[in-house]
Amino acid sequence: MLRYCLHRLLIGLGMLLALTILIFVLLQLTPGDPIDAYINPNVAMTQAEMDALRAQLGLDRPLPVQYLAWLGQAVQGNLGHSLQRFNETVSGLIASRIGPTLLLMAAGLAIAIVIGVTTGIISAVRRNSFLDYSFSVLALLGISSPAFLTALLGLYVFSVRLKWAPSGGMLTPATDFSIPDLLRHLALPALVLSIGHAALIMRYMRSSMLETLNQDYVRTARAKGVREFWVVVKHTLRNAMLPVVTLIGSTIGLAVGGAIFIESVFNWPGMGLLLINAVETRDYPVIMGATLVIGACVIIVNILTDLAYAVIDPRIKVT
């Protein structure tokens, strides 16, 4: 097990390194001068002053040297300073934003798992029934709907028209922190984030349950007079969950992408909103730092998913 974890960790580090190189190259290919993000447009600067500032920031060095310098600092935990918020470090900005993003993703995935697994089981057990057809149609709609469109539609219906949920933010301004207020703001973004993932989980769960229900040991349990409820819970559910666990781990990356759109629509103060603002203002250190942290989180979750797969099914050996 330890050898497997180290092997996967080394592969993950290689993928993370490749990701940072790709983002660094793409940032260099974007039009414009990075120094523009550091200059106050209301203050006139001579070319000599701009060259001095560029040298101070290390932007006059060759690109490979710039990347290696950034990587060396990142390994030590120093992700640099924001070009737009001069007194704030990138690490500090990420630390203040990663909590809300993790909360949003955890809530969204929890809702998706509950809805997807439950409806998948019902559809499989009640195959070709009205419920089965209804859940299948809803799942198809959920998979086909883009995250940004679902977010805008949910915002319009539940916030603008029905007034059931706040239109944005994480807490009500000028009020003390309270759990009920946080949950009111969290409910709609988390529900919107869960829709596509719940649809995928439902389809996988239904297919896996149908396959497992046709196994010989399930038919034997039924022949012995075991109640259908216990046939599903004790003899079918655990084995049917194996491909779903893999799917849940693989959807973490998709959840990150969905969270970026949803945070921008609902003004949720997380990593997605931070990354979008950094791209808009060409804040390169924040873009690189946020990309590094997001990539590391996705890789770690994928490793944990593989380990969970082995725990659920002891027959599987990780080597």
Curated annotation (Swiss-Prot):
Taxonomic superkingdom: Bacteria
Membrane association type: Multi-pass membrane protein
Disulfide bridge partners, by residue number: none
GO biological process: peptide transport; protein transport; transmembrane transport
Species of the source: Brucella suis biovar 1 (strain 1330)
Localization per record: Cell inner membrane
Residue ranges occupied by any ABC transmembrane type-1 domain in the UniProt entry: 98-305
A cellular-component GO term for this protein: plasma membrane
UniProt-listed Pfam families: BPD_transp_1 (PF00528), BPD_transp_1_N (PF19300)
UniProt subunit comment: The complex is composed of two ATP-binding proteins (BRA0404 and BRA0405), two transmembrane proteins (BRA0407 and BRA0408) and a solute-binding protein (BRA0409).
Known function: Probably part of an ABC transporter complex that could be involved in peptide import. Probably responsible for the translocation of the substrate across the membrane.
Protein name according to UniProt: Putative peptide permease protein BRA0408/BS1330_II0405
Sequence similarity: Belongs to the binding-protein-dependent transport system permease family.
InterPro entries: BPD_transp_1_N (IPR045621), MetI-like (IPR000515), MetI-like_sf (IPR035906)
Entries under PANTHER family matching the protein: DIPEPTIDE TRANSPORT SYSTEM PERMEASE PROTEIN DPPB-RELATED
